């Protein structure tokens, strides 16, 4: 029987967080990371820095829009669409196959993140799920940025460094996947609601970027 989803999530993140501590790192055998995975780790670190800077600027610019983590209504646009935490479950926590993400892999990952064709099923599933997360956020951010650029006040728009960082990590993952459709709206944009949603998405994406960076660190070290 698998542990409860909430307990599993906490356990996974705690384990991944421990990998950051030098005391544990000294006790681990020194692996030889693949150049491809190391490249993806660099991209994930760049992405984390970019989203952190973008969020900080947004909180300063939109200080009257309730843009702090304590004030916003947290939302996960990937909920019920991807299962990154389960897909990236560390081998140390894998007791049986029923604890893995149940959906079959319909994606073929052939990007530079994979060291060879012998990459495990779990690694392929993990990287594919990360790719899907990034793709969904990329579509949302591009649609939102298009609205913000229409704002006569020109108060805020997305940092190109963050959009570039997303694109570079997507290219490194290079998953053959169905393109996420971008719904175009004919309605007059509500710039106030758009800026509120921007805050919500930036907070959610930073949390996801932290998770992705830890997953990449784990895969690079394993």
Curated annotation (Swiss-Prot):
Q: Which Pfam families match?
A: IL12
Q: Which UniProt keywords apply?
A: Cytokine, Disulfide bond, Glycoprotein, Growth factor, Secreted, Signal
Does the keyword section mention Secreted? Answer: yes
Which domain of life does the UniProt lineage start with? Eukaryota
Sorted alphabetically, the Gene Ontology cellular component annotations on this record are: interleukin-12 complex
Q: Where in the cell is it found?
A: Secreted
Q: In the UniProt record, does the keyword Membrane occur?
A: no
Signal peptide limits = 1-25
Q: List the disulfide bonds.
A: 40-113, 67-199, 88-126
Q: Which SUPFAM superfamilies match?
A: 4-helical cytokines (SSF47266)
Where mainly located? secreted
InterPro entries noted in UniProt: 4_helix_cytokine-like_core (IPR009079), IL-12 (IPR050676), IL-12_alpha (IPR004281)
The residues that carry sugar chains are: 42, 96, 110, 183
Q: Which sequence ranges are marked TM in the entry?
A: none
Q: Which GO terms describe its molecular function?
A: cytokine activity; growth factor activity; interleukin-12 receptor binding
Q: Name one GO biological process term.
A: immune response
Q: What does this protein do?
A: Heterodimerizes with IL12B to form the IL-12 cytokine or with EBI3/IL27B to form the IL-35 cytokine. IL-12 is primarily produced by professional antigen-presenting cells (APCs) such as B-cells and dendritic cells (DCs) as well as macrophages and granulocytes and regulates T-cell and natural killer-cell responses, induces the production of interferon-gamma (IFN-gamma), favors the differentiation of T-helper 1 (Th1) cells and is an important link between innate resistance and adaptive immunity.
Instruction: Family membership, please give it.
Output: Belongs to the IL-6 superfamily.
Q: How does it assemble?
A: Heterodimer with IL12B; disulfide-linked. This heterodimer is known as interleukin IL-12. Heterodimer with EBI3/IL27B; not disulfide-linked. This heterodimer is known as interleukin IL-35. Interacts with NBR1; this interaction promotes IL-12 secretion.
What name does this protein carry? Interleukin-12 subunit alpha
What broad taxonomic lineage does this protein's source fall under?
Eukaryota, Metazoa, Chordata, Craniata, Vertebrata
Give me the gene this protein comes from. IL12A
């Amino acid at each position: 029987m698998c542990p409860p989803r909430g307990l599993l999530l906490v356990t996974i993140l705690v384990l991944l967080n421990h990998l950051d501590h030098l005391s544990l790192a000294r006790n681990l055998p020194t692996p030889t990371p693949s150049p491809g995975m190391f490249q993806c780790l660099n991209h994930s670190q760049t992405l984390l820095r970019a989203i952190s800077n973008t969020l900080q600027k947004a909180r300063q610019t939109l200080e009257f829009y309730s843009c702090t983590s304590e004030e916003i209504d947290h939302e996960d646009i990937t909920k019920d669409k991807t299962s990154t935490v389960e897909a990236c479950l560390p081998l140390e926590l894998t007791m049986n196959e029923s604890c893995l993400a149940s959906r079959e892999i319909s994606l073929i990952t052939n990007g530079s993140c994979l060291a060879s064709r012998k990459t495990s099923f779990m690694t392929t599933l993990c990287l594919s799920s990360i790719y899907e997360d990034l793709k969904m956020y990329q579509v949302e951010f591009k649609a939102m940025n298009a609205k913000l650029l229409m704002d006569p006040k020109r108060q805020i728009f997305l940092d190109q460094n963050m959009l570039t960082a997303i694109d570079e990590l997507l290219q490194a993952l290079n998953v053959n996947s169905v393109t996420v459709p971008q719904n175009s709206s004919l309605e007059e944009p509500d710039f106030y609601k758009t800026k509120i949603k921007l805050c919500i998405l930036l907070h959610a994406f930073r949390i996801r970027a932290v998770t992705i960076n830890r997953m990449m660190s784990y895969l690079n070290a394993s």
